[in-house]
Amino acid sequence: MLPKIAVVEDEEALSVLLRYNLEAEGFEVDTILRGDEAEIRLQERLPDLLILDWMLPGVSGIELCRRLRQRPETERLPIIMLTARGEESERVRGLATGADDYVVKPFSTPELMARVKAMLRRAKPEVLSTLLRCGDIELDRETHRVHRRSREVRLGPTEFRLLEFLMSSPGRVFSRSQLLDGVWGHDIYVDERTVDVHVGRLRKALNFSNMPDVIRTVRGAGYSLES
């Protein structure tokens, strides 16, 4: 599963630029143009890092940052404040409100990308790791290779993403709709039964030579990967 970055920026051209550069660095990006919309979206799906503009319609970035820090589920969310306010007093205010870093516009795109990676290394090193392990299964994000008990498992691209998603939270039960969002994305319409087809293919690939089945079906709930 790709590291998720949420960008809350009301300048559409800048939002597009940030999405392009972040996706080129291997991140999954969700762009939001309004502060009030961001507050709702962040409750529905929590990113690994938030890039937040100060001046936003609906709810200001500084107010949104304050609210996020008051909630248990977002109190540790890495936040980079992105703003044209470069005065020392404003930087101090942004950091005191809860931002972890403060970048003043105009900014260097390569420097911002470096700051994003540095913050993720500190706050969530697991999301940048190329190697995932769960039980006797090993998945390498960089080489797109999977091994079980040292034997290579051949997977198609969808089955690879599905396994990666399940391995990101071993033991957690994901509904079909959650798997669709996490593996196929929000903007692609796929019937929920498609999930069953790909889970079946993944099972078949992993369970060679009478290997124990590590994918658990929870009736009426979804699927999980046994750890």
Swiss-Prot record:
GO BP: phosphate ion transport; regulation of DNA-templated transcription
Localization of this protein: Cytoplasm
Protein name: Phosphate regulon transcriptional regulatory protein PhoB
Maturation and modification: Phosphorylated by PhoR.
Residue positions where 4-aspartylphosphate is found in the record: D53
Feature: DNA-binding region: 129-227
Phosphoprotein is among the record's keywords: yes
GO cellular component, one term: protein-DNA complex
Coiled coil: none
Pfam families noted in UniProt: Response_reg (PF00072), Trans_reg_C (PF00486)
A Gene Ontology molecular function term of the record: transcription cis-regulatory region binding
Entry-linked NCBIfam families: PhoB (TIGR02154)
Keywords recorded for this protein, A-Z: Activator, Cytoplasm, DNA-binding, Phosphate transport, Phosphoprotein, Transcription, Transcription regulation, Transport, Two-component regulatory system
Job of this protein: This protein is a positive regulator for the phosphate regulon. Transcription of this operon is positively regulated by PhoB and PhoR when phosphate is limited.
Boundaries of every Response regulatory domain copy: 4-120
Entry keyword annotation includes DNA-binding: yes
Organism classification: Bacteria, Pseudomonadati, Pseudomonadota, Alphaproteobacteria, Hyphomicrobiales
